[in-house]
Amino acid sequence: LTEATGGIDIVYNRMSAHLRPAIGKLTREGERPQRIRYYRTGWQDDACTSFLMPGMDETTLISVPRQIAYSAPPAGADLTAGLLALTHLIDAMKPELTAPIIAALFMPPMLRPAGLGNERAAVFIAGRTGSLKTSWAQTAMCLYGPGFISNDNLLKMGEGATRNAIMAFAAHAHDLPLLIDNYKPNTGNGKHDFVNLIHNILEGGDRKRSERSGALRDSKPIRCIPVVTGEDLPRDDAASIARILLVTFDWQRGEPNDHLTAAQELSEHLCAVGWSWLQWLRTPAGRTATKAAAKTF
């Protein structure tokens, strides 16, 4: 291209649209990579045969905000070590508390193949400071990317992100859980924002808005399941409570939790478990099993 036009040639007004095809014509056919960019995760289409995830391959580019650290497993991720980490994660608290949350984390990618895309519920992990709810939830989210273990990637409600910002994050996180940390009733607009946020996410999008001309603004669909941590769940709105699985962690009294520590040390391998789950769901056997499960719902 430089030999044909010169490295400092200008692009005239309204001619930029011709630049891409010109580069294509001046590039040898075998040296022209084809890449597709998406701004969300999740199933590529309703056939549910390909799941979009950052790092999945070199020809598919997934651009999502840093704080939703979804990622295909790195080269060193080991499934056996990931399963061991998952076992430690379940045993870190009472299994009757942790098992339902783990099941809820596996649920988002199977809803659309099962035809249950509108049958979503949220998860709220409650507990006082020192119950390790955030540390446990961070580690569990590593099922879908090792970067969730970093505190820098925590999406904090109120003090760290407004309701509208969280809705924007949710629009990128299709068919996956979205961790929202540290809900506090006295931060920001408190329970009012929380109730509206849960309704908006579970109903598939924010309210419709129009422009001054009367035309409707484009709205992005929401297809994630919120997993929220906080000291207590707002009890004033019956409709939102009915759509939330509440799990309460006991205070740990400042004592070390060896199972959680072991899970954290192996957290980089947890994404191998999540990736195996996603790959199985896209197989004929996986799709058949999800549809059979949907019939019993």
Regions found by a protein language model. Name each.
Residues 171, 210-228:
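AAA+/SF3 P-loop NTPase mechanochemical coupling elements
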Residues 220-222, 237-297:
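Phosphate-sensing "switch" segment of ASCE/P-loop ATPases
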Residues 181, 223-231, 246-247:
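Structural recognition of the conserved hydrophobic beta-strand(s) that form the central parallel beta-sheet
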Residues 57-156:
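P-loop NTPase catalytic core of nucleic-acid-dependent motor ATPases
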Residues 136-191:
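AAA+/P-loop NTPase substrate/partner-engagement loops
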Residues 185-186, 233-235:
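Residues immediately C-terminal
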Residues 1-96, 140, 168-169, 173-175, ...:
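Conserved glycine-centered beta->alpha loop in an early N-terminal alpha/beta scaffold
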Residues 194-213:
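Conserved catalytic/switch belt of AAA+ P-loop NTPases
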